């Protein structure tokens, strides 16, 4: 493997990772590399947190053996315009692509392609696997979540956690599918342009802070058998415009 920070702040510009390397530890290639390639027959399986931090590469093709990607793998890779993810990848973190899809990055930055057969897909700028909405990568004004998605993960549209504050004003509407059963904590925190939300009939769990600080949210309709609206952060905390709320008769607890 290549250990943590092995090439940190190196003046090297090009590197070919030997086929024998199975793991890149955190910040393993942190530096000014303009070219990163992988030897034929690569056995690489794991890429650690911020592994390519600050690199000046414009494109990257990961080997077909890679299984997992850590946190903020492409952090501050402002020249990177193309990443190809193989179908072998089965583990991606919520923030794997954070600070790669950056409002301050070079124009065109943020093109991720998943190989045919991958369990992951990008649709309208949102990253999914077969059942989960993982994270928004490229913010849009209107999002329709496809049928079949059961879970919206924590921080999925959290405008505070994406490192790009301008996104707070982007999302104006989102349509949720009937298949949805759970919304994670802080899922839509600080989506300040969101004006209304209808939570479908099969949703039984809404995490704390899910819609907190959605300052334009005026209408919220909860149709599912939710029993609690609790958490360390209130589900609708800071929703100053909220005037119309429909709650289910299954609700037994509101608070923290």
Which residues does each predicted region cover?
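Structural signature of tandem-repeat unit edges
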Residues: 1, 10-23, 32-46, 55-68, ...
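Eukaryote-biased recognition of intrinsically disordered, low-complexity regulatory segments
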Residues: 131-137
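Consensus positions within tandem repeat domains that build extended binding/scaffold surfaces
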Residues: 3-6, 25-28, 48-51, 70-73, ...
């Amino acid at each position: 493997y290549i250990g943590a920070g092995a090439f940190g702040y190196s003046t090297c510009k090009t590197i070919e990772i030997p086929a024998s390397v199975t793991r890149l530890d955190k910040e393993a290639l942190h530096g000014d590399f303009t070219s990163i390639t992988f030897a034929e027959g690569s056995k690489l399986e794991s890429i650690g947190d911020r592994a390519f931090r600050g690199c000046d590469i414009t494109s990257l093709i990961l080997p077909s053996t890679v299984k997992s990607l850590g946190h903020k793998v492409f952090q501050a890779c402002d020249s990177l315009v193309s990443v190809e993810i193989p179908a072998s990848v089965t583990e991606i973190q919520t923030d794997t692509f954070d600070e790669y899809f950056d409002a301050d990055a070079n124009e065109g930055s943020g093109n991720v392609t998943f190989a045919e057969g991958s369990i992951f897909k990008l649709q309208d700028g949102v990253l999914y696997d077969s059942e989960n909405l993982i994270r928004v990568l490229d913010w849009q004004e209107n999002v329709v979540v496809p049928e079949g998605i059961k879970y919206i993960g924590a921080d999925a549209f959290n405008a505070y956690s994406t490192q790009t504050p301008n996104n707070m004003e982007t999302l104006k509407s989102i349509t949720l599918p009937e298949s949805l059963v759970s919304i994670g904590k802080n899922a839509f925190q600080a989506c300040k342009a969101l004006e209304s939300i209808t939570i479908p009939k099969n949703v039984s769990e809404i995490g704390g802070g899910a819609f907190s600080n959605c300052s334009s949210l005026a209408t919220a309709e909860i149709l599912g058998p939710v029993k609690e609206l609790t958490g360390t952060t209130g589900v609708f905390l800071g929703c100053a415009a909220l005037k119309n709320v429909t709650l289910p008769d299954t609700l037994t607890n509101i608070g923290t």
